[in-house]
Amino acid sequence: MTRGRLAPTPTGYLHVGHARTFALAAARASAGTLLYRTEDLDAGRCRPEFADAAIEDLRWLGLKWTEGPDVGGPHAPYVQSQRLPWFQNVWSQLQAAGAIYPCDKSRKDVERSLTAPHAEDDAEPIFPPALRAPLGAGRE
């Protein structure tokens, strides 16, 4: 099954690019489901009226999703900030398993590494390989 997701940040009115992206995702997911989740983690700038307007604008364009804040579904909640307890639970599980470890690299270190030439490998994660410490390194 294919699942697509649109997650606009309600810091302003929906941009036409969001609608285009969502329309493409909807077309590609024709054999699956499409999930709408509001990315409201920028608490200082996100406003409920923009979240409501995004849904209204996409509905006006005739776009439909299978799951979302306005229709519900099995993977609720569909407002990202309401999912924090789920993330905290996963964090606790990882912590209990000893799978959380600190990274001693700054954002500048990571940015610098991303601009350095290195081999392309689609199977590699985006985080620069040269900055990856062995699992558990730095733990006491």
Language-model regions: role of each:
Residues 1-119:
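N-terminal Rossmann-like or analogous alpha/beta NTP/dinucleotide-binding catalytic cores
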Residues 107-140:
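Active-site cores that bind ATP or allylic diphosphates and position pyrophosphate for catalysis
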